Amino acid sequence: MALTLEQKQKVVAEVSEVAANAYSAVAADYHGLEVAQLTKLRNQAREKGVVLKVVKNTLAKRAFEGTSFECMSDKMVGPLLLAFSTEDLGSAARVIHEFAKEHKALEPKLVSVGGELFGPEEIERVAKLPTRDEALSILMATMKAPVTKLARTMKEVPGKFVRTVAAVKDAKEAA
């Protein structure tokens, strides 16, 4: 059953809204996945804050106009599942990459982050990007390191003085 013009406009608006608020997107060939497997993938994606959409490529191309995922439009061929990261950069890539390891029928085709298009070989690299919380903790540890080092150095001065006085005392007693 073909979609009416009104239904197509609704789909384009919906995908466009998701794309406008997403950090990254992954397009994967899902041909060969069974319904139960696709349902499992949707559940895993929902838990990780990833939005999955299966739409016609022409509608997706229209939805991507004016977004950072416009770069994907020329490379979209065949039946594709679109996964959008709404919480952090790597969540969609992580979900698709992990699921593709178990189910060979799911084949990542395109990855887009920040207006840059990457091939399927880059999905693992994007999947390994830290989550927002991990990135913040790394940043805080980096910022905290010089302060901690300074505190240790300042604490060491009196300790070194005490050890020097003790060494002089021991030397005088020995003489």
Curated annotation (Swiss-Prot):
Signal sequence, start to end: none
Keywords attached to this entry: Ribonucleoprotein, Ribosomal protein, RNA-binding, rRNA-binding
GO CC terms: ribonucleoprotein complex; ribosome
GO biological process: translation
One function term, GO molecular function aspect: large ribosomal subunit rRNA binding
The keyword Repressor is assigned to this record: no
InterPro entries found in the cross-reference section: Ribosomal_uL10 (IPR001790), Ribosomal_uL10-like_sf (IPR043141), Ribosomal_uL10_bac (IPR022973), Ribosomal_uL10_bac_type (IPR047865)
Domain of life: Bacteria
Family indicated by similarity: Belongs to the universal ribosomal protein uL10 family.
Quaternary structure and interacting proteins, as annotated: Part of the ribosomal stalk of the 50S ribosomal subunit. The N-terminus interacts with L11 and the large rRNA to form the base of the stalk. The C-terminus forms an elongated spine to which L12 dimers bind in a sequential fashion forming a multimeric L10(L12)X complex.
Functional description taken from the UniProt entry: Forms part of the ribosomal stalk, playing a central role in the interaction of the ribosome with GTP-bound translation factors.
Name assigned to this protein: Large ribosomal subunit protein uL10
Organism: Psychrobacter sp. (strain PRwf-1)
The gene coding this protein: rplJ
